[in-house]
From Swiss-Prot:
Species: Methylobacillus flagellatus (strain ATCC 51484 / DSM 6875 / VKM B-1610 / KT)
Pfam families per record: ACAS_N, AMP-binding, AMP-binding_C
Family assignment from sequence similarity: Belongs to the ATP-dependent AMP-binding enzyme family.
Name the record gives this protein: Acetyl-coenzyme A synthetase
Catalytic activity from the UniProt record: acetate + ATP + CoA = acetyl-CoA + AMP + diphosphate
Amino acid sequence: MSSIESVLTETRVFAPHETFRQAATVSGLPGYQALCDAAEQDYTGFWANLARQEISWQTPFTEVLDESNAPFYRWFADGKLNASYNCIDRHLEKRANKIALIFEADNGDVANITYRELHQRVCRFANALKKQGVGLGDRVIIYLPMSIEAIVAMQACARIGAIHSVVFGGFSAKSLHERIVDVGAKLVITADAGIRGGKQVALKASVDEALELGGCESVEKVIVYQRTGVDIAWNPHRDAWWHEVEAAENDNCEPVWVDAEHPLFILYTSGSTGTPKGVQHSTGGYLLGAIMSMKWVFDHKATDIFWCTADVGWITGHSYVAYGPLALGSTQVVFEGVPTYPDAGRFWQMIERHKVSIFYTAPTAIRSLIKLGGDLPHKYDLSSLRLLGTVGEPINPEAWMWYYKVVGKERCPIADTWWQTETGAHMIAPLPGAIDLKPGSCTRPLPGIIMDIVEEDGTHIEGTGGGLLVVKKPWPSMIRNIWGNPERFRKAYFPEELNGLYLAGDSAHRDEDGYFWIMGRIDDVLNVSGHRLGTMEIESALVANPLVAEAAIVGKPHDIKGESIVAYVVLKGERPEGEAAKTIAGQLREWVGKEIGPIAKPDEIRFGENLPKTRSGKIMRRLLRSLAKGEEITSDISTLDNPAILDQLRQSAG
C-alpha cells in the first residue's frame, strides 16, 4: 500500500494556560510522559493499579489480563463488582445531597435530582424490573427520550445484572425491530412520545409497530414512561405504566454483584450495512475506561458542572452521561432538546444558566451553530467554562478556531477526542494540562493506549506518514464481542493480515511531533491519479473558505484518474443556483487549489441547504457516494433525518 498523503498544513499551536496547567490532574508534558512510561514498563500492572484505586470491588480481582483466547480478551475476570453501586451507592456517605443530574426539558423546564434521590429511584425501578421477571443476563431494550428516566432505566438494569441495549429514539420501528430480535429482549422500556424542537416524536407507536413485525416472541412486557400524555394504543396483558410499577416498590434494592466480564450493555453501531452489529461491552473494564478518560481528558474536578450533549442512544451518552460522570460523583446537565430550539442560542443560554464548566459536543453541532449565529455566544456569560470537547468526527481547523476563540474566549483548552462505540472510551485525546493543541488534531494517545499507523499488511510506518489506524495492545474498555456473532467480530476488528492488531477502520497521519490526525474512514480515502488523499483534508480546506458552512467529499469512479472528487457544499448564505452556483463553484475550486494543491480540486461541486445526516448528526457518506455515481437510493434510509435533501444534491453546479 502506498502511504496516504497528508496535504493539510496546520502550523498553529496552543499551549495550556499556566493557571490551567498548574491545577490540572496531569500537569505538564513530563506528567503525561511519566504515565506513558509507567504503562510501557508494566502494562498490566499499570491498569491493575488504576482499577484498584478507582473502582469499588465486592471481590477484588487477582487476574489482570487473560489473553489465552485472543482476540476475546478478558480483564479483571475473577473480580466482582456492580456498575450501579459504583455510580451511586458509593457516593451516599459523603455526597448524598449533591445534585447528580440537572435535567432541562425541551421547553426549558428544569428538574434536579440528588444522588440520594437517584439511588431511591433506581432501586424502586430495579425492583419493578425484577417483579416483571427480569434478572441476571436478561436483555432489556431501552427506547426513551433524553430524560432522568433513561438514566434510571440504564442504572436499574446494571443494578440487577440485566443487560441493557439502548436504541436512539430517532430510529424507526424497523431498526428497533432488528435490535429487539437480534438481542432477544425480554422487556422493552419506552415512552408515550418524546419532545424535540417543540415537536412530539412517537415512541410507543414505534414499539407497537416493531413488535407486530414478528419474531419478537421473547418480549414479555413493555413499560411506558408517560412523558407527554398523548393517547396511545394499549395492550393490558403486556403494557404497564412506569409511574405505576415504580410507585408500588420500596426504595431499597441490593446490587447484584457480577463478574467483571459480565456484559453491562450491548449497543448497536449506526450506519453499518446488513444486519445491525451489537457491540458487547464488559462491566469492569468498561467502567475503568469511562472513569480514567473523565479524569485525564476532561480533567474532572468535584466542583465541575459537566455537560455532554449526546443522547444516551449513542456510546458518548453511555460513557459520558450514564456512567462516567456518575462514577466520579459529578453534577451534570442532561438535555432533552436540540441546539437550535427555540433558537440557535440554546446551548449558550444553558451554559450561562447552569454555570457549565466542561462542555462536550459534536463538530456537526458546532458547524451548524456557526452558520445560524456565529456571534451569538457573545450575548451570553460563558465565563463558567474551563474546558471544551468535541466528539463524533474530526473537527475542521476553522470550526476548532471558532470554538476556541468565540466560545472558549481563548482560555479553554479543547479536547478533540478520537474513539469509537467499540473502544468504549477515549483513545486519542489531549490531556489538557499537559499537551499543546493543534487545531484539527486529536493529538496523542492516552496513557496505556498503544496506537500505531500501519500499511495494509500491518507493517509499521516509521516517523511521519499516513496509513491505517490500529491499536497494538488490548485495553480494558475494548469491545468484547459482536453479540451472537464471534466470527464477525474477529473478521471486522482483528483481520488475519494485521496479525493481532485491532483495526479501527480509520485512516490517520502522524506528524513530526507524534500527533495523530484522523483523515476519515478507510472507505473515505480517495485515490486520485495515484495519490491517496484523505477526504477530511479537502473538507477542511473548503470549510476554511468564508462562504462555506459545511462540506463533504466523496470519490466517484473516473476512467483516467481512478477517482474524481465530488464535493457537497452548504454555504453560510442561501443555496446558489444557475450561473451563481457555477461562479461560486469555480471560486471554491481555485480556493482548494491554493489551500492544498491542484490535485485536490473537486471535479464536481453540488450545493445543498444541508447534508444528509443521521439523527445523531453524522453525515451519511454512503448516500453521497450513491448520489455521486447517479445511483438510485435503494438502501435503508430510516436513520436519515432529512430525506428531501437528496434531490437537491443530485444536481451538479459543475
